[in-house]
Amino acid sequence: MTDQGSVAISALVFDEEHVSVLVGGPVSAERFMVGGASIVIGPAETVITVEAGDSPAGSGVWSAEEVRLTGPAPASVTERLMGSPWAADESSLQIHIAVRLGEQALYLGTAKVSRARTSDGVLTNCELRFEAPLSRQLLNRVRPPLPAVDLPGLEWLRNVKGDRAAALDQFITGWYSDADATEPPATCSPSCLPAGLRQLYRLARQRPSALGTQNSILPEPGLHTDHLGEMLVFGVENQGGFFWSLLWTLDGPEADPTVWFREFDEEPIAEQEPLSGFLIQFSLFEASMSADYLALPRTLTAAQVARFTEALHLVPLRPFWPWAPTHFYVAPGLVVHVSSEDGEKFDAWAGASHRSALAPLADLPVDWIRFDG
């Protein structure tokens, strides 16, 4: 094994003696349990030992590049991982990662904190990035593949060219669970809104995430006209940089109106799909962006995009989003969106409902920023 730390460990399997050596001795070491992980903090370094397995809600190896801790964590752990504003910064001390397999522990290498979240000063979640990625063989040993599950299907795709209302309903009810529903299902009440928006609001009563987590469709009480009083604003970017709207009239709504994209000080631009297609595209985009399991390649060429998407199904809609025209590709439990501003360099983002859905992308010859498969 390549030496990644200040103390060489000659074998992959290590024991309490190795832990003591790494942290600087057993006498002054502090021991904690955080989200099922054992954390030993010493004057020299830190050892984090997680359980083998694949539990999205708990601490453990997340991918070949990442290990996650789920808190809350005590103050000593928070200070060691994040540093302390009133004392010497301890966050630069090395962090060693191990995984427990039955009665033995395997040393995986060193890692650095890449992202952490706190609540009232308490560490709640922490992501650490391995300094040297794990091999696929080792990853499968310490994070055994989950058993196969029924993935969201593609029945909805057959309706995109015909019954788009059915396609939207099938995709949202297939992708999102209604376990967190807070309101009973309801039929659409009479409204001046187009049928597509009424349908989305009905679906969102049982599946609130259908209104978006990256960008969002405004709840019905939040709909408003723009500053000129000409357009009904119904969708907004998460930082307020742009919005989507429909032409506002006192007459009844169009059956399938044009959707207008607009930065606040720019002229509006028509989305290429009317509302029925736009809502499918919006739902696909939000599903991929908010997915638990992601695959994010670095910038791709057109040839790489063709290879990246060859095992997937193209969603037969015109490009979404005027800023960077975006196409969607799908497989069971998987949504990929590919965009380009110049037609030469492409950005791709894949989101999956289950880790196994990323399998079609696993062996692609691309440089990954992140791959959760």
Regions found by a protein language model. Name each.
Residues 273-281:
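Flexible glycine-rich active-site/ligand-binding loops centered on an Asp-His dyad
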